[in-house]
Amino acid sequence: MLSIENEKRIEKWIEDHKEEFIADLSKIIAVPSVATPGVSEGEFPFGIESANVLAAAKEIVEGYGFPVKNLDNYCLVANVGEGEEKIGLFGHLDVVPCGNDWNYPPYQLTVDGDLLIGRGILDDKGPLWASIFAVRCLKDLDLMPKREIEIFMGGQEECGMNDLLHYIEVSEKLPDVSFTPDGNYPICHGEKGGLRFYLAIPCSDEKIVDFKGGTVKNVVADKAVATLKNVCAECL
């Protein structure tokens, strides 16, 4: 348990680094980072956008004094502290497509009162960056646990998680316990899975030519469009 004195030290550290946090996070938000599904041959397994955000994050995190490894443009790994046991901190830098009709520019961090707005601010660039700063705080204040902390920054969580599979394949030692800042409270112990399916139904109405909406499966559709024929405007 932290002492009251250390709690105050942490609060002061957070306040002193708030502007730096927002400035660095804005650089990450500014990088479009929609990953491609599957695994492509060559230098960029998840496309150039995913590789770009990994490169941007690596440069910034190395500036904090953390050694960072780029695992073949699948993900980044930063290791901090020492110990026989390892704590894994898992987040991702790829995002889902933006869609249309944003009230704010999606790839520009907007500060509106106490709100931070931008694509990935909640899933998962913002929480991941807050966690990185939390590790910085522990390190700067000499409050690190007697364990190594390994920060995983993924490049393809939204459409396959091949970044995590590659990490598992090439890692010499996996974490003993892990935490992922990729969800709202309350804390959950696990996720049973997700259901994605195709539904086909017969349609006897010849007026409907086409019906579609959305861009990818894991995003709420911003609009739906139907193409009709032989329908008068008054009937709609």
What are these regions (language model features)?
Residues 71-73, 154, 211:
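Conserved beta-strand termini and adjacent loop/short-helix elements that scaffold enzyme active sites
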Residues 2-88, 95-98:
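N-terminal helical capping/dimerization or prosegment-like subdomains
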Residues 86-153, 159:
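Active-site metal-coordination/substrate-binding segment of hydrolases
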Residues 68, 109-111, 199:
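A structural signal for short hydrophobic beta-strand segments in well-ordered beta-sheet cores
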Residues 158, 162-236:
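Midchain, well-structured core segments that form catalytic/ion-binding scaffolds
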Residues 83-87, 112-113, 145-149, 173-176, ...:
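Short coil/turn connectors at secondary-structure junctions
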